[in-house]
């Protein structure tokens, strides 16, 4: 019914603007521990993640970490808003959030999935045209016994009006 892009965000004072998928994997698995290892200041990296029960957690693990485990001691947050707040208040912080949650309190990172040849800004346009790599489809599952009750909603959400609502709430 829609697509969701995940943006990697850091504290606004962080000088790092670009990271490769491999560097992100290193950061979130604990192999890279200091920003100086990726071109930043000599500062400890503080990584934030969603809780293990979150679909966002699983998707980031599959897409970015290539199913490697998150580092021990990663700071798990119950909601995206908590990641935004924590990253905005912690100079060495990094986390990932849905594209719709980006605001001026955090700095989005440009990401490369081609070993650093091309870095792409997380934006609705880049996600929609598939230039930005961290994008997942969103599905609506229902029991077929309830199809009569659910079909009007599915028809609406797939209509032009429904898709406008999807975009308005931050999905693609």
Question: Predicted segment positions?
Answer:
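Exported/periplasmic ABC-transporter solute-binding proteins
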Residues: 1-172
């Amino acid at each position: 019914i829609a697509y969701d892009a995940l943006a990697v965000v850091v504290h606004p004072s962080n000088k790092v603007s670009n990271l490769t998928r491999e560097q992100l994997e290193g950061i979130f698995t604990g192999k890279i521990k200091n920003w100086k290892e990726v071109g930043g200041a000599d500062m400890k990296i503080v990584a934030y993640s969603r809780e293990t029960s979150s679909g966002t957690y699983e998707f980031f693990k599959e897409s970015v970490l290539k199913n490697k485990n998150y580092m021990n001691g990663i700071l798990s947050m119950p909601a995206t808003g908590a990641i935004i707040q924590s990253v905005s208040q912690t100079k060495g912080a990094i986390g990932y959030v849905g594209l719709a949650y980006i605001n001026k309190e955090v700095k989005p990172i440009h990401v490369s999935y081609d070993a650093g040849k091309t870095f792409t800004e997380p934006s609705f346009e880049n996600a929609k045209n598939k230039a930005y790599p961290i994008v997942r489809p969103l599905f609506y599952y229902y029991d077929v016994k309830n199809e009569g009750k659910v079909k009007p909603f599915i028809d609406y959400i797939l209509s032009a009006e429904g898709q406008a609502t999807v975009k308005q709430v931050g999905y693609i």
